[in-house]
C-alpha cells in the first residue's frame, strides 16, 4: 500500500544482516526494539551500528520499550524513534516521533491541515501519560515480582512454575501441572479478568489480563499451549490476581 518492497533480515545474525545490505541495498530499515520471538537476542545498538555503517537510515519501533529502557532507538543510533502515546496511558490515535530534526520538520510539513494536527488537549493528555507511565510500570513490575515469588512458592498448588517474560509487555507465564489452560481462561473472564487487551498498557486496561500464549511462543513450544497462560497485572494487585486464579481453577 505504501509502494514499498519489503526486504527481511535476521537481526540476530549481524553477518547475515551485512550480506543482505550488500546484496539488496535497502533505502531504509525498520527495527523493533522489543523482541518478537523467544529466540530473539539481538542488541539494538549493534544492529543500528551495522545499518549506520552501511549508510542505511533506520527507524525504530519503540513501543513497550519507552520508559522501561535506558536508551530508546534514536539514542542508540537510529535516525528516528517512533511509539504510540496510547500505549503510555495517553490519548487514542496519537503517536510520537523523536530524532533527526530534518525528518521531524518534513513530518511537520505534511501536517499543515488543522484536521491532522494534534490539538492542545491531546498534547496535555500525552504529557500526563508520560509522567504517569513510569510510575505505573514500576508498580506493575512490583506486583509481577511478588506474584512470581508467591506462585513459585506454592501459593497455588495447581501451578507448576511461573516466569516473568518480556513478551513486549512484561508478563507472567504461568504453567500448570495439568493441561487446564483453556478452561482457566474461560473461567477467569467470568470472574472479572480481561480476556483480550484493548491496547496493551493503555489507560483503559484496569483489571488483570488472563490470556493465552502468543503465537510466536506457541510456535516455539507447542506443548505449552495447553498448560500455560499469560497474566498481565495491569492496575491490579497480587491478591486480586491470586483470587481470580484460585477461583478459576476451583470452578473447573
Where are these regions (language model features)?
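Short secondary-structure junctions
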Residues: 8, 156-163, 191-198
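Conserved PLP-enzyme active-site core in the AAT-like
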Residues: 1-137, 141-159, 186, 247-248
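Short, flexible, solvent-exposed loop/turn segments with mixed acidic/basic and small polar residues
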Residues: 83-86, 159-165, 216-223
Amino acid at each position: 500500500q505504501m509502494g514499498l518492497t519489503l526486504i527481511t533480515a535476521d537481526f540476530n545474525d549481524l553477518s547475515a544482516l551485512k550480506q543482505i545490505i550488500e546484496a539488496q541495498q535497502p533505502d531504509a530499515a525498520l527495527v523493533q526494539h522489543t523482541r518478537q520471538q523467544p529466540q530473539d537476542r539481538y542488541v539494538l545498538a549493534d544492529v543500528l551500528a551495522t545499518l549506520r555503517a552501511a549508510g542505511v537510515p533506520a527507524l525504530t519501533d519503540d513501543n513497550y520499550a519507552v520508559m522501561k529502557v535506558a536508551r530508546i532507538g534514536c539514542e542508540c543510533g537510529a535516525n528516528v524513534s517512533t511509539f504510540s502515546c496510547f500505549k503510555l496511558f495517553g490519548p487514542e490515535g496519537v503517536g510520537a516521533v523523536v530524532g533527526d530534526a530534518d525528518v521531524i520538520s518534513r513530518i511537520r510539513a505534511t501536517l499543515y491541515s488543522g484536521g491532522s494536527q494534534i490539538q492542545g488537549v491531546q498534547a496535555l493528555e500525552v504529557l500526563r501519560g508520560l509522567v504517569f507511565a513510569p510510575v505505573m510500570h514500576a508498580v506493575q513490575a512490583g506486583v509481577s515480582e511478588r506474584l512470581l515469588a508467591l506462585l513459585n512458592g506454592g501459593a497455588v498448588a495447581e501451578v507448576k512454575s511461573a516466569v516473568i517474560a518480556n513478551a513486549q509487555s512484561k508478563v507472567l507465564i504461568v504453567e500448570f501441572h495439568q493441561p487446564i489452560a483453556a478452561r482457566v481462561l474461560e473461567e477467569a473472564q467470568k470472574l472479572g479478568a480481561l480476556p483480550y487487551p484493548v491496547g496493551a498498557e493503555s489507560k483503559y486496561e484496569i483489571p488483570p489480563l488472563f490470556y493465552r500464549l502468543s503465537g510466536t511462543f506457541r510456535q516455539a513450544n507447542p506443548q505449552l499451549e495447553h498448560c500455560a497462560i499469560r497474566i498481565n497485572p495491569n492496575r491490579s494487585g497480587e491478591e486480586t490476581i491470586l483470587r481470580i486464579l484460585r477461583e478459576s481453577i476451583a470452578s473447573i
